[in-house]
Amino acid sequence: VGAGTANTEFECITAMNLDFFGPGEYPYKTVLQKKTCESIAFNLKDLGYRTHAIHNNEATFYDRYKVFPRLGFDTFTPIEYMYHVEKNPTGWCKDQILTEEIEKALDSSVGQDFIYTISVQGHGKYPSFSYYCEQIGEMDLFISQLITMLNQRKEPSVLVLYGDHLP
């Protein structure tokens, strides 16, 4: 768990099990540098969805700027294109910015959207238990604001959340 978010992403987006790859394999750094791969984004595009990826970290982290188009995403918005970014005391971007970015992606197209968003606020190392609790509280507020925004829109939404980091 942790120290391999790109591999967790790969498994979730493609439904491929990394056990079938070599030890220490990071498809984002190897096979996806030059090849495309079937994914939920490609499948939903075939059904008429616009596909967006959003990440409040640098585009070059795990080469996502190269990989996301090869996984079927029409657009990718990394932190370099976000305004009013706030960082937590350990330097990670706060997740609250993501609600605005998700809403922009929803507003950018007519019809159905698939928006895959990766957050970073909860990344360790945690200097103290109270710091960890504060970050969880802020992330909880972000999720509440995101749900409120989605509920105010006229289109139906499905929100799926998962994590790959333990405290």
Name these PLM-found stretches.
Residues V1-P167:
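Solvent-exposed soluble domains appended to multi-pass membrane proteins
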